């Protein structure tokens, strides 16, 4: 049985407000790409997986290259994604890049969610 704590609602409200401020979904990103909005899409998966398919226009920046900050921009939003919902590599990258002053969001669900939504895949 789940315990309910007083104050949980306020914590939950803050959590979801923060989550919405720093995550976006694949359909929204696809719309931004289609409208040629000024965003940078960063794929933090391994290079071999990036080559098999990725979000159109994405830049591959695997973990071993995070220190280079290659492709990141300070003047626009950098949208980070990894493999799937249970992959925390995107969140780790976003934290590291944000700590260095880059505006970041994470794509909810990773590349798996992109594919599940039937969106265009680049190779």
Functional labels for PLM-detected ranges:
Residues 41, 58-60, 104-106:
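Conserved beta-strand scaffold positions in the cores of enzyme catalytic domains, especially
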Residues 59-67:
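Glycine-rich, highly charged phosphate/nucleotide-binding loops
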Residues 59, 77, 121-123:
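Short, hinge-like loop/turn segments at secondary-structure boundaries
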Residues 72-115:
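Catalytic cysteine-centered active loop of the rhodanese-like fold, especially the PTP/DSP P-loop
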Residues 50-56, 69-73, 114:
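Short loop/helix-cap segments at secondary-structure boundaries that form the rim of catalytic
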